[in-house]
């Protein structure tokens, strides 16, 4: 299987979103993810009931600025913390 060419300035990565108060924060998280649908490749959400926490993994393909804006808006939501790992522009380990 061949690798798709990477557009100039585009980065592939995963954004981990930890949601502490799902009932209050989920609508805002979903609204932000919808706003950035153009860079979202896919997402998977897991409710971790034992810790009263939800974890969402979001695969993104966008510029550093777009991904930074997405993570900034998500991280500004009360009860939400975010961490992104991006693929190096030329491949290899995440930076």
Segments predicted by a language model, with ranges:
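Long, contiguous binding/interaction regions
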Residues: 1-95
